[in-house]
């Protein structure tokens, strides 16, 4: 249809130009000739273009159609991790070309990125996968495990730590063994302190009586009564005994804490009692009191000093404290008073009191008023207890036996309630 239209248009223009030219010939021959040439050239060009397009369409319709490219086939291979990747076809739409690298392959749409699979060599099992060891790199030297010193440092550190632990353990054991006796003594003292104080007087009394029995053994070997007879006579006026005797019975105890020992244990006499017994034996060698007194006045003086110190320590123990420096006890004249002096002890009447056989044992307590001047009730208690012990030693009903007549007869005394008590 286009060709027909073009031909018709060309004919129409040609006819128009011919008519125009004829008209111009009449008016002006030159101008019309030029205009007609231009129209002819334009029509010729258009007709040539139309004829060229028609020839191309005929050629295209006559040529056979081109074939589509076949999809590529990617071969199976071992990747960089040693895993086997199976083969696959690239037939999904436009992704028909096998692209990528030898270790990683995929499908793509660009032909220019196609992979040349014939150049890859990872189609067989690698050697390092068979031996289980990675291949040695060319730039690394051969590794010699015998020259590796890293394990030696670990061994040295562990050895030093083990030695330090052993030294600490043995040091601790040595210190515990060195301090064990002190701990035993401290625990024993604490256990004695924490015991009930109600049994202290009875235990002290029984221990003191056991020691007195030993003294009587050295003084008189003839008569002796059981120690149980003395329990009923001295239970009411029992006071804490001398801490010197406690220290002789227990060398590791503390005098101010009132240590307690087993009342049934027989305590051996201490150094002072042995000295007293030896001096007593020297003083009573001939059996006569007068003769022995004339022969050994020094022995009697030592005995009197011993009993004086003993009673003084008993009074201080009853108050609960001991002097930090030695106190000299001076002798004073003896007092004459009725034999039965009433004295109250803790609100109770004491029993019959007599003068003990040792006059120097009951001296005035005015020298100790610096410790506790208002402690009059304790002083009365000490005097009452001393008189009681003197009665037990000299009376005929003494449970420990009759004392030998080595001392003058007891002298009466009495105690007043005055704070400034003077003995005449």
Curated annotation (Swiss-Prot):
GO terms for cellular component: AMPA glutamate receptor complex; dendritic spine membrane; glutamatergic synapse; ionotropic glutamate receptor complex; postsynaptic density; postsynaptic density membrane; postsynaptic membrane; synapse. Residues 1-23 form the signal peptide. The chain crosses the membrane at residues 150-170. It is found in: Cell projection, Dendritic spine membrane; Synapse. InterPro entries: Shisa, Shisa_N. Residues 333-424 are annotated as: Disordered. Coiled coil: none annotated. Its main location: membrane. Keywords: Cell membrane, Cell projection, Glycoprotein, Membrane, Postsynaptic cell membrane, Signal, Synapse, Transmembrane, Transmembrane helix. Residues 171-424 are cytoplasmic. Residues 24-149 are extracellular. Belongs to the shisa family. SHISA9 subfamily. Component of some AMPA receptors (ionotropic glutamate receptors) complex, at least composed of some AMPA receptor (GRIA1, GRIA2 and/or GRIA3), CACNG2 and SHISA9, as well as low level of DLG4. Regulator of short-term neuronal synaptic plasticity in the dentate gyrus. Associates with AMPA receptors (ionotropic glutamate receptors) in synaptic spines and promotes AMPA receptor desensitization at excitatory synapses. This is Protein shisa-9. It comes from Homo sapiens.
């Amino acid at each position: 249809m286009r060709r027909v239209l073009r031909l018709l248009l060309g004919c129409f223009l040609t006819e128009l130009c011919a008519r125009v030219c004829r008209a111009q010939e009449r008016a002006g021959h030159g101008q019309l000739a030029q205009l007609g040439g231009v129209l002819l050239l334009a029509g010729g060009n258009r007709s040539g273009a139309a004829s060229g397009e028609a020839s191309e369409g005929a050629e295209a319709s006559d040529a056979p159609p081109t074939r589509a490219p076949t999809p590529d086939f990617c071969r199976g291979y071992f990747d960089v991790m040693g895993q086997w990747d199976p083969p696959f076809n690239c037939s999904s739409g436009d992704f028909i070309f096998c692209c990528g690298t030898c270790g990683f392959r995929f499908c793509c749409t660009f032909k220019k990125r196609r992979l040349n699979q014939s150049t890859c060599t990872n189609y067989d099992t690698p050697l390092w996968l068979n031996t289980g060891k990675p291949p040695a790199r060319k730039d690394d030297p051969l590794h010699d495990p015998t020259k590796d010193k890293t394990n030696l440092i670990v061994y040295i550190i562990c050895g030093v730590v083990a030695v330090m632990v052993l030294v600490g353990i043995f040091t601790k054991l040595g210190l515990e063994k060195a301090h064990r006796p002190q701990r035993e003594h401290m625990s024993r003292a604490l256990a004695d302190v924490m015991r009930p104080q109600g049994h202290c007087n009875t235990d002290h009394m029984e221990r003191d009586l056991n020691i007195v029995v030993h003294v009587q053994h050295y003084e008189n070997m003839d008569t002796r009564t059981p120690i149980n007879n003395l329990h009923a006579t001295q239970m009411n006026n029992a006071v804490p005994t001398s801490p010197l005797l406690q220290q002789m019975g227990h060398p590791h105890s503390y005098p101010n804490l009132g240590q307690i020992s087993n009342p049934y244990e027989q305590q051996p006499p201490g150094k002072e009692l042995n000295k007293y017994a030896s001096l007593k034996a020297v003083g009573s060698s001939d059996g006569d009191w007068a003769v022995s007194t004339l022969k050994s006045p020094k022995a009697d003086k030592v005995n009197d000093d011993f009993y004086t110190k003993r009673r003084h320590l008993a009074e201080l123990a009853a108050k609960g404290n001991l002097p930090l420096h030695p106190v000299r006890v001076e002798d004073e004249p003896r007092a004459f008073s009725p034999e039965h002096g009433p004295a109250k002890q803790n609100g109770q009447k004491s029993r019959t009191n007599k003068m003990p056989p040792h006059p120097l044992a009951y001296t005035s307590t005015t020298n100790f008023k610096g410790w506790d001047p208002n402690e009059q009730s304790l002083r009365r208690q000490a005097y009452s207890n001393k008189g009681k012990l003197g009665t037990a030693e000299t009376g005929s009903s003494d449970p420990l036996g009759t004392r030998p007549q080595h001392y003058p007869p007891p002298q009466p005394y009495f105690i007043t309630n005055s704070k400034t008590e003077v003995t005449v």
